[in-house]
Amino acid sequence: MKLKLMFIACFTLLLVGCTGSEIKIKPENFLLDQRFNESYSSIGLLDASTGKNLPSVGNLTEAFSHEIRASRVAKDVYYPARPDDKTDVTFESNFNSELDTHSGSAFAKSFLTGFTFFILEPIFWYDFDYKFSGTVDVLKDGKVIKQSSAVTDVTLSVKWLSLGDVSKLESEAISQGKKSLFNQLLRDVHK
């Protein structure tokens, strides 16, 4: 009976630290909800993306157009821009997104967790690293007048017993990462 109670007490103590999750963004959303004073009356947005894009991230150029509207950098935003659109400037954007799941280390951590009957579980974090990068060329009459580049790194960390929450947390991490990237770009390209 004492052995059973001791086992239950140890199991309860171990379970306390067995779940957890966190999202780290570099750089953080320093311009979150900041509004600009219509730097341009109209912007045309072109997608020049040629790199990798994760399906879960979606169309970054379209999301960028929504962020431009929300931040009020321009009165009118045309996406996709057509040749007959009358715009002050055209933003030619190129976005990439990558994911590193650290598969090798995740396998080793899972093996050690199971091999030690979950005793080591509280010390292992499973990381999913997202990297968002983007460049925007500001064109006026077909000539580049300004260029901006930005990179955002997002790390989604979870413990083994929280791995089931990754799909829920992924959308939040991606949303915050895109917001950080777009805020960096908008800070640099507005007048």
Predicted segment positions?
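C-terminal/domain-edge helix-coil "capping" segments
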Residues: 19, 23-27, 31, 124-191
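Structural motif marking the loop-to-transmembrane transition
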Residues: 2-3, 104, 108, 166, ...
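Sec-dependent bacterial lipoprotein signal peptides
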Residues: 1-19
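Surface-exposed short loop/turn segments
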Residues: 84-145
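A structural "domain/chain start" motif
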Residues: 17-83, 151, 189-191
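Short, low-complexity, polar/charged sequence segments that are solvent-exposed and flexible
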Residues: 62-66, 110-117, 157, 167-169
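Hydrophobic beta-strand residues in large extracellular and virion-surface proteins
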Residues: 43-45, 64, 68, 89-93, ...
